[in-house]
Amino acid sequence: MFWFKNVMIYRLTSPLSLESHSLEDQLQQTKFTPCSQSDMSKFGWSSPLSGSELLHFSQSKQFLLVSHKEDKLLPANVIKKETEERIAVLEEKEARKLKKTEKQAIKDDVVAMLLPRAFSKHQFTAIWLDLDAQLVYVDAGSSKRAEDTLALLRKTLGSLPVVPISFALLPSEVMTNWIAKGHTPNWLNLLEEAELKSFDTDSVVRCKRQDLESEEIAQHLQASKFVTKLAIDWENHFSCVLNEDATLSRVKFADEVREKNDDILKEDIAQRFDADLLLMTEELKLFTQKMIEEFGGIKERI
């Protein structure tokens, strides 16, 4: 099961509804296929469930998709060295300097020669659509990776009007108050890790294994620094780092959560996948609702 390790949340700006059969037909049009000998990269949809030919997994209005990207790894220095050697040989043979277009053609030939022997890097990115709440969750540690997968989904569906979720209150201000004023929600435990920034001077303080209620941290906050990253623990649910843009990184679900479905036989892969997905999505739904409450509600963008 694709237990999310990072969470980037997007809000649909106009209603989206999907039907399993029609969605599957659309996904098949942009299905992942491996790189051929002449391809540098390929990007498409793979099955979330091992052994299944379906390119999505659904539970009522919940849909899980997985994008699959393959990149051929060609070290730039290898290409450069081989290209320069070929250019030097040809220039000496013809007693002239090659044109820019001729050099590019040689480089293209070098790449074509090396591609069949290149190693591949594979990257899988899970995306969960909660159409009950009209929210989209992407398991990505960077905006680019998330946007690439959203762009693939947009291409697949024809349109996908989404924006990053935002709130009435700035998460950085709320997190700062949690520490500075002791307003930490009773469902939340602060861990000993944070990042503080001064927006006037661009100075950054990163703390690890640090008591966040210490005098040292208080002095930083009094010096107009804001909390931009905060390691938190939602007891018996999961721990993570909450960022100023309301994204979550280093998400680690508690053993109590991950072991809830251990009574399902390992051989029942589909049943266990279904149960784990329901478990994970319910946890993230609950946490999202708590964030919405703490940050003053979702801010509608025009």
From Swiss-Prot:
- UniProt cross-references to InterPro entries, sorted A to Z: RdgC
Which top-rank group of organisms is this from? Answer: Bacteria
Q: What is a biological process (GO) this protein takes part in?
A: DNA recombination
Give the record's GO CC terms.
bacterial nucleoid; cytoplasm
Q: Enumerate the subcellular locations listed in this protein's record, separating them with semicolons.
A: Cytoplasm, Nucleoid
Q: Name the keywords, alphabetized.
A: Cytoplasm, DNA recombination
GO MF term set = double-stranded DNA binding
Q: Summarize the protein's role.
A: May be involved in recombination.
What family is reported? Belongs to the RdgC family.
The name this protein goes by in its record: Recombination-associated protein RdgC
Species whose genome carries this gene: Actinobacillus pleuropneumoniae serotype 5b (strain L20)
